[in-house]
Amino acid sequence: MEKQYRVLLYYKYVPIEDPEAFREQHLAFCKELGLLGRILVSSEGINGTVSGTVEQTEKYMETMKADPRFADMVFKIDEAEGHAFKKIFVRHKKELVTLRLEDDVDPNETTGQHLKPAEFYEKMQDPNTIVIDARNDYEYDLGHFRGAVRPDIEAFRELPEWIEEHKDMLEGKKILTYCTGGVRCEKFSGWLVKQGFEDVAQLDGGIVTYGKDPEVQGKLWDGQCYVFDERISVPVNRVEHVIVGKDYFTGEPCERYVNCANPSCNKKMICTPENEYKYMRSCSHECRTNPRNLYVKEHNMTEEEVNARLAAIETEDHAAAE
């Protein structure tokens, strides 16, 4: 049975003359339709994820495609049980994806070769190919292409510097890169080309498109794909499911992300329900004892209950150390 809601993922690098005016009009349009989601608008284009009913999302796509600027924009469509967002945000930003380069990249002028999923699948297996994940470390940790390089970065803007520091591993290699939907790779692969790397290609449509492709069926992907909405993750490999995520506290296989309950920390952690309970969804003793701890507030824990949990953790830590 077809689900009543859908999630749309899309982007388009195209000049938008007055992005602030566009932002205001677009927000009003989304509210009128009843869509929820997060949309970024800049002078270089649009990048968004929205959720709504089948009717609402159809109307949105139809209206967008009627605008010559977005006539050929590709929408990746996921069925959903309900909304994937709580609110609607349309924000004006300087860049669609933040790289802060001195010499900016226009993907309409310079970008890596686009590979369809079947081509990407084949080239990934070439021994002279290096596959670079263009996402953040916490996205990689939940799932990635088998054998892909994990840049040690917490934000996309850190990627060029990481590449500069690890240039040796790329010398003489064919470079493949990928991200969730393709918007980051358009710029990143273009930056690689401008740096003088000659054989640079990107996964057209990103991981989301790869997972839906009827030919490759998500093969050679391990784990889940992190997404920036209420779903947190979506499956990719339809042939086999290999769990690569590891619980923050015990290292056991796990694919469940939570945020540290200390709001000033908010660290993303892969964590089982049992360990969320045991450690009060907090990454450290400092976060567990923080007076603003959200887990304590959500569960209306008394001081005695908190101290009992802390004592249990301390007892186990001592036992493990002996």
Curated annotation (Swiss-Prot):
SMART domains: RHOD (SM00450)
Active-site residues annotated for this sequence: C179 (cysteine persulfide intermediate)
GO MF annotations, alphabetized: oxidoreductase activity, acting on paired donors, with incorporation or reduction of molecular oxygen
Family matches, as HAMAP family: TrhO (MF_00469)
Source domain of life: Bacteria
GO BP, sorted A to Z: tRNA modification
Xref: Pfam families: Rhodanese, Rhodanese_C, UPF0176_N
Annotated PANTHER family: RHODANESE-LIKE DOMAIN-CONTAINING PROTEIN 7-RELATED (PTHR43268:SF3), THIOSULFATE SULFURTRANSFERASE/RHODANESE-LIKE DOMAIN-CONTAINING PROTEIN 2 (PTHR43268)
EC category: oxidoreductase
Gene: trhO
Protein name, as recorded: tRNA uridine(34) hydroxylase
Listed EC numbers: 1.14.-.-
Domain Rhodanese: from-to ranges: 125-219
Reactions performed catalytically: uridine(34) in tRNA + AH2 + O2 = 5-hydroxyuridine(34) in tRNA + A + H2O
Stated family: Belongs to the TrhO family.
Function of the protein: Catalyzes oxygen-dependent 5-hydroxyuridine (ho5U) modification at position 34 in tRNAs.
Keywords attached to this entry: Oxidoreductase, tRNA processing
